[in-house]
């Protein structure tokens, strides 16, 4: 049995769907929302790499590396903001974040 593009697209669709459900079903915990965004970005990267391998073009793989770099920076900055917010407010609930000034 050969692993084709359909298998990669199926796994990518499942990851993307899990990420979307994670965002919509859990609106109270910011950390789970960030992890769901990372799942969505992982699904997009899997699509880029799968199509890059099938088409024989390296542009998709290079773009996936850029997306991974931006996702890592986004996760680091998001978690740093959450740590500072937790130290100031004592909670990371989404309802408390809506009450921020600025």
UniProtKB/Swiss-Prot annotation:
Gene Ontology CC terms, in alphabetical order: NADH dehydrogenase complex; plasma membrane
GO biological process terms on file: ATP synthesis coupled electron transport
Recorded GO MF terms: NADH:ubiquinone reductase (non-electrogenic) activity; quinone binding
Locations listed in the record: Cell inner membrane
Membrane topology annotation: Multi-pass membrane protein
Catalytic activity: a quinone + NADH + 5 H(+)(in) = a quinol + NAD(+) + 4 H(+)(out)
Broad class of enzyme this protein falls into: translocase
InterPro entries noted in UniProt: NADH_UbQ_OxRdtase_chain4L/K, NUOK/Mnh_C1-like
Swiss-Prot/TrEMBL keywords: Cell inner membrane, Cell membrane, Membrane, NAD, Quinone, Translocase, Transmembrane, Transmembrane helix, Transport, Ubiquinone
TM region positions: 5-25, 31-51, 66-86
UniProt-listed Pfam families: Oxidored_q2
EC number, UniProt record: 7.1.1.-
Quaternary context: NDH-1 is composed of 14 different subunits. Subunits NuoA, H, J, K, L, M, N constitute the membrane sector of the complex.
Family of the protein in this entry: Belongs to the complex I subunit 4L family.
PANTHER family linked: NADH DEHYDROGENASE SUBUNIT 4L-RELATED, NADH-UBIQUINONE OXIDOREDUCTASE SUBUNIT ND4L
Function: NDH-1 shuttles electrons from NADH, via FMN and iron-sulfur (Fe-S) centers, to quinones in the respiratory chain. The immediate electron acceptor for the enzyme in this species is believed to be ubiquinone. Couples the redox reaction to proton translocation (for every two electrons transferred, four hydrogen ions are translocated across the cytoplasmic membrane), and thus conserves the redox energy in a proton gradient.
Protein's name in the database: NADH-quinone oxidoreductase subunit K
Organism expressing this protein natively: Chelativorans sp. (strain BNC1)
């Amino acid at each position: 049995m050969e692993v084709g593009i359909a298998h990669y697209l199926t796994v990518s669709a499942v990851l993307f769907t899990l990420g979307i459900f994670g965002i919509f079903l859990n609106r109270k915990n910011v950390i789970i929302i960030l992890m769901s965004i990372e799942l969505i970005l992982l699904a997009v990267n899997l699509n880029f790499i799968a199509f890059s391998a099938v088409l024989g073009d390296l542009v998709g793989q290079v773009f996936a590396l850029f997306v991974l770099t931006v996702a890592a920076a986004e996760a680091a900055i998001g978690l740093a903001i959450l740590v500072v917010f937790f130290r100031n407010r004592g909670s990371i609930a989404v309802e408390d974040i809506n009450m921020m000034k600025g």
